[in-house]
Amino acid sequence: MSPGRAARAEPIPCVITAMADEFGGEIPVGPFAIIGDDSIGRGIVETLRGSRSRAVLMRNHGPFTIGRDAKDAVKAAVMVEEVARTVHISRQLGEPLPIPQADVDRLYDRYQNVYGR
């Protein structure tokens, strides 16, 4: 589901609490880049700089994720596909309702700093 959003240069809006917990907001879209040099890497870094998201949809490519280690990056990749699917399904019923940023901030802080500790 996420490559379709990358093809449209459409970020994944933060519409479920699990997404607020894991990504701290929407999953952004990075620029188009030609494979073969460091353009994709630079685009990923520039897009995620200043963002809490561990995922980016690179325009016309698809999702890229980062993490503390490989397992964490794979967890983020699985979550990207799950939330992309959720948004796609919810759009069949109408426009999904984004979580207000103040609530996203509270959810992210609780999950990252309190939950499970």
Model-found features: residue ranges?
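Glycine-rich flexible loops
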Residues: 1-117
